[in-house]
A protein has these predicted regions:
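Bacterial Sec-dependent N-terminal signal peptides
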Residues: 1-16
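Extracytoplasmic/secreted cell-surface and envelope-processing proteins
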Residues: 27-30, 57-64, 198-201, 324-327
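N-terminal post-signal-peptidase region of extra-cytosolic proteins
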Residues: 30-37, 161
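Proline-aspartate-enriched helix->loop->beta-strand connector
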Residues: 45-49
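Low-complexity, serine/threonine/proline-enriched polar segments
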Residues: 72-140, 222-272
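Extended, H/D-rich, highly charged conserved domains that either
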Residues: 141-278
């Protein structure tokens, strides 16, 4: 009897994940056709979306990572524009969410809510509210609202890191947020993990230093072999570039094995190179280790936070070079079913 109950509980807790590898910037691509992606997301019927942001707690606990200074710069500006004491932020956010639930077209309150989320170091949901205001202004000019947004959020000053400027041509503005709004979702869940960013950067620097010496020395002895490997890498990125310049469905291609292999070669070269004499294999394996650790952390965050939210079907949106790593990790997790966007018909 206990075994039956335990098995039933495990079955009930199964999590389904729709994983989408994306570009972080679609601005230089041809006009993109997202119709199939939208259709598949709607068909999947998710109850939550996860994006590549740090949670409030992680943002406060991680002392440094690639866009920490940018986030602190935004925080400083928005506090100068209008500060809200930290203890008042939860109540302010709840109150504004109540207003917006009653009056979805109150874009002044949405601007206030974006501001409060940013002050609360919840960049994911600050961006979601800012995007809705920005998108409204693109369709319905409103000088008073535009002035209010500029005074409160200073979007023209937020230009680096995961900024408001970057948001406008990102995977969130083009894929996640339109579908979240259509499906009536009010929250973007954070899943990023930056606990190992310093280790990652140190291992990257170690590889670069030793690879430069390896390339200089090896070119004399194994020049043809090394040139052949570099040709393979360069040919891959020519293919990548060709897709980005010509395809109306870049996202679908980014979720293919071909794209994953090419993308990985940019960070990790080719596995065939690792056993070449004097190749910095130990340093490269360390670099790969820290990349896997970040992806493992992201997957763990999805699992734990989906469970806490009571979500059983979730969309996970991550940069293209995360997609295969995360899918492999999710596939090894008990009670998890994962498909990438191309596998969902």
């Amino acid at each position: 009897m206990l075994l039956v109950l335990f098995s039933s509980e495990l079955h009930a807790q199964k999590l389904e994940i729709l994983l989408i590898g994306v570009s972080h910037n679609y601005s230089s691509y041809p006009k993109q056709d997202f119709a199939d992606i939208y259709r598949k997301i709607e068909q999947f019927k998710p109850t939550a979306f996860f994006g590549e942001f740090l949670s409030k707690a992680d943002e406060q606990n991680v002392m440094d990572y690639w866009c920490k200074k940018d986030n602190l710069h935004r925080l400083k500006i928005l506090r100068q524009n209008r500060n809200i004491p930290a203890l008042q932020l939860p109540k302010t956010i709840d109150s504004l969410n109540t207003i917006i639930k009653q009056k979805p077209d109150d874009f002044k309150s949405r601007t206030d809510l974006a501001h409060a989320y940013y002050l609360d170091e919840d960049v994911a949901n600050g961006h979601y509210q800012y995007w809705q205001v920005f998108n409204h202004l693109q369709q319905h000019a409103n000088a008073d609202l535009s002035t209010y947004v500029d005074k409160l959020l200073s979007p023209k000053l937020d230009t680096t890191g995961r900024s408001m400027k970057r948001l406008i041509t990102s995977e969130y503005a083009l894929i996640a947020f339109p579908m979240m709004r259509k499906l009536g979702m009010t929250t973007l869940y954070a899943m990023d993990c930056q606990d190992y960013d310093l280790n990652w950067n140190a291992s990257w620097a170690a590889v670069d230093e030793k690879f430069a010496a390896f390339r200089k020395d090896t070119a004399k002895v194994f020049q043809n072999e090394l040139n052949s490997h570099f040709k393979s890498i360069n040919d891959g990125f020519k293919r990548y570039d060709q897709v980005e310049k010509s395809s109306p469905k870049v996202t679908e291609w980014l979720n293919t094995p071909e794209a994953s292999t090419i993308s990985a070669s940019g960070d990790f070269y080719l596995p065939e190179m690792y056993d070449m004499k004097n190749f910095p294999k130990v340093e490269m394996l360390s670099k790969i280790h820290w990349w896997i650790m970040r992806n493992q952390g992201m997957c763990n965050n999805v699992i734990h936070r989906a469970k806490a939210a009571g979500a059983r079907k979730v969309v996970v949106i991550a940069g293209a070079n995360h997609r295969k790593f995360m899918q492999d990790i999710f596939e090894r997790m008990p009670g998890v079913k994962v498909q990438n966007i191309n596998q969902l018909k």
